[in-house]
């Protein structure tokens, strides 16, 4: 069964950071649906929406947390749901 996760990452910017994160996601057969990245001064921040087998979530989290100087947060989300906001 697939799970949708939103991954946030932040830490000092450096060369190869996106490649390193992407490689780990690929190694764990995660499918990147969308991502946003930004550099603020010397800091890097990234949001990624992925699909991954639900039983691989913890293994992926452990692998990401091995990257030096980056902090990760993984949140399970639901499929695209339309939400109507009233003003």
Question: Residue spans of the language-model regions?
Answer:
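A conserved regulatory-domain signal marking ACT and ACT-like small-molecule sensing domains
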Residues: 1-87
């Amino acid at each position: 069964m697939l799970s949708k996760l939103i991954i946030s990452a932040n830490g000092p910017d450096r060369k190869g950071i996106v490649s390193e994160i992407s490689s780990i996601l690929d190694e764990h057969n995660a499918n990147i649906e969308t991502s946003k990245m930004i550099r603020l001064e010397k800091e890097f921040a990234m949001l990624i929406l992925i699909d991954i087998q639900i039983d691989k979530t913890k293994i992926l989290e452990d692998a990401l947390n091995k990257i030096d100087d980056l902090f990760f947060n993984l949140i399970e989300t639901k499929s695209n749901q339309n939400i109507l906001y009233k003003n």
